[in-house]
Amino acid sequence: MQLKRVAEAKLPTPWGDFLMVGFEELATGHDHVALVYGDISEHTPVLARVHSECLTGDALFSLRCDCGFQLEAALTQIAEEGRGILLYHRQEGRNIGLLNKIRAYALQDQGYDTVEANHQLGFAADERDFTLCADMFKLLGVNEVRLLTNNPKKVEILTEAGINIVERVPLIVGRNPNNEHYLDTKAEKMGHLLNK
């Protein structure tokens, strides 16, 4: 286990009241959060989203990505379902960090795509570690998930880490003129399952 569960509190939101559960990485002290809605203790698969931190999309309403749109759509779907989990995976910019993400944006403004920009900065296309999320699910007592994602790699890694993904639920929202090239690149170079 790479994490420990350290704190929890009620979090009222526009979608209803969630239980916010805080986790701490044992090796680094980095924190991550789960938002739990309703009773997840039933022995049926739980609707869940692994959402990687995106300050620009989630909090600053950037149209360069689909992250903020996905966050809102996932919370809406979880609330409508009556139970579910959103794991807020604190690995900003596919885990290159906020400042490098800004540098990558500058390279994209010069014509590089999102993958090329990461490579120009010395990073892989995706530096995230989703095994941490498998540990969060396990600490929440969840083993079977209906995963809200367009990323087949996320499904593969969580499955290899012991989480039974019984269904991949598409989450295709937020396409606009500012992020079309970004989304097309994610589909073409990173294998994301995105329909235009």
Swiss-Prot record:
Oligomer and partners: Homodimer.
Keywords in alphabetical order: GTP-binding, Hydrolase, Metal-binding, Nucleotide-binding, Riboflavin biosynthesis, Zinc
E.C. number: 3.5.4.25
Cofactor(s) named in the record: Zn(2+)
GO cellular component: cytosol
Pfam families to which the protein is assigned, alphabetical: GTP_cyclohydro2
Job description of the protein: Catalyzes the conversion of GTP to 2,5-diamino-6-ribosylamino-4(3H)-pyrimidinone 5'-phosphate (DARP), formate and pyrophosphate.
Residues that, per the record, bind Zn(2+): 54, 65, 67
Residues forming the catalytic site: 126 (proton acceptor), 128 (nucleophile)
NCBIfam families: PRK00393.1, ribA
Biological or metabolic pathway of the protein: Cofactor biosynthesis; riboflavin biosynthesis; 5-amino-6-(D-ribitylamino)uracil from GTP: step 1/4
UniProt gene name: ribA
Catalytic activity: GTP + 4 H2O = 2,5-diamino-6-hydroxy-4-(5-phosphoribosylamino)-pyrimidine + formate + 2 phosphate + 3 H(+)
SUPFAM superfamilies for the chain: RibA-like
Cofactor binding: number and manner: Binds 1 zinc ion per subunit.
One MF term in the entry's GO annotations: GTP binding
Name the UniProt record assigns to this protein: GTP cyclohydrolase-2
Primary enzyme class: hydrolase
